């Protein structure tokens, strides 16, 4: 039972507290090299925590108050559906669509007509319908855009006069599946002309912000909770805003933020109880960042238990990653991997002290999660969780072996291991047992075969990680575990920029397969499939401006503050 916090603070106090938090510094040292330049994993330098946990636990805003929740329900009743497609789009971007999931699906299921009937509505409406229906798993053929081409099969240049339509076609193109040349052409055509229009300043201020935002990262790739915070400000400045919808969005954001703060407080108490921060002084102590990851993957308020469990998973992954990446010797790592694989608590006396507490923390967490599943669902999930952790540790061990030997694998060898070592498959397996009820053994076996949506999600986050954590000009000199850029450069002889370009191409290809996997029938719930997609989105988000997970530059910190600690200001 979560104890009711004794301290509530206003938005202004939260802002002041947040500025104190943001002044904290964090360093994350990689591999150390001695004077002889031999690789050394043992690190005696502690990692200072990146957030003041006592201050974090005191943060509250008044929007957890019951009267705001009641007001939110009242606003729901007052809403009028005027333009269905635009309303659905606004609900999604404002972070409100989870209130109306069944209604939205019913609407999208009912509005589809033949291609010829939709085309007269113009590029904007056609692109919007295409994007929304594909997002929700409905079949929509790429040929819906054929009528917007000229006799040569190219998109009509007259479309450039419809800036909003051009923008929405650009966003729709990122719902592309494999072998959809129309959408690939659409993406290239729209990106080229939107950049030109921006450069020539032939655009109004309201649309300019949307275009710049989309060109930086398309909507389909964005973390939706963060997008909601950004879009609320954009929507408020619009002349056609719906004041009821705007107020509901602000209230809902603040209410959900208060719920998230409560979840964070619970996980901070758990983390403190493990003692890992004190015993593993070499490891990163980044619970707030771990929680931010989880919020990005499953933010809806009703999934609090899943958020808390998955944040614990992320914390254990971070600690074990640092054992392999920063501290353990090769012999120690082989021994730890063996103990995890055998799941043998009686063997921990063979481990050094820092590994004993690490394994016991993992062992206790998995058994506790499995106990709850057995009690509530009657299913023993320990074998599945054991396998997921063993697979992760074996992938970490392979990377450590490459490091100690100085070996740089081929790109394919690297990726075959790295899509597991990024930890996404492990997180997704745990998520299944948090969000898909009742647990079905046949579904779990299907999950164990690594359904395409899981592999694609993992590959996207791995490639985004490698692009973000490999600073330009430093990547080829790194003494760390080789990343995909080094592997590609060594294998092909290409320059670093060509390697980055190829990785960006692989990300687009993985998204195509992900889009396909979302529309194919599978035994998984829409919530679970959405989680897998959101894992990929978090990869794009966290590594968009470098390594937002490990190094606290201003952009990731500002995002965390706005999402977790700063309520939206009071209404006029």
Curated annotation (Swiss-Prot):
What the protein does comes down to: Monoterpene synthase (mono-TPS) involved in the biosynthesis of monoterpenes natural products, constituent of coffee beverage aroma. Catalyzes the conversion of (2E)-geranyl diphosphate (GPP) into linalool and beta-myrcene, and, as minor products, cis-ocimene and trans-ocimene. Not able to use geranylgeranyl pyrophosphate (GGPP) and farnesyl pyrophosphate (FPP) as substrates.
Q: Biological process GO terms, please?
A: diterpenoid biosynthetic process; monoterpenoid metabolic process
Q: What is its EC number?
A: 4.2.3.-, 4.2.3.15, 4.2.3.106
Q: What do the Gene Ontology cellular component annotations say?
A: chloroplast
Q: What is its main location?
A: plastid
- Could you say which protein family the record assigns here? Belongs to the terpene synthase family. Tpsb subfamily.
What is a single molecular function from GO for this protein?
myrcene synthase activity
Domain of life, source organism: Eukaryota
Keywords linked to the UniProt accession: Chloroplast, Lyase, Magnesium, Metal-binding, Plastid, Transit peptide
The UniProt annotation places Mg(2+) 1 binding at 321, 325
The reply to whether Transit peptide figures as a keyword in the UniProt entry is yes
Q: Which organism is it from?
A: Coffea arabica (Arabian coffee)
What is this protein identified as?
Linalool synthase TPS2, chloroplastic
The record describes how the cofactor is bound as: Binds 3 Mg(2+) or Mn(2+) ions per subunit.
Enzyme class of the recorded protein, top EC level: lyase
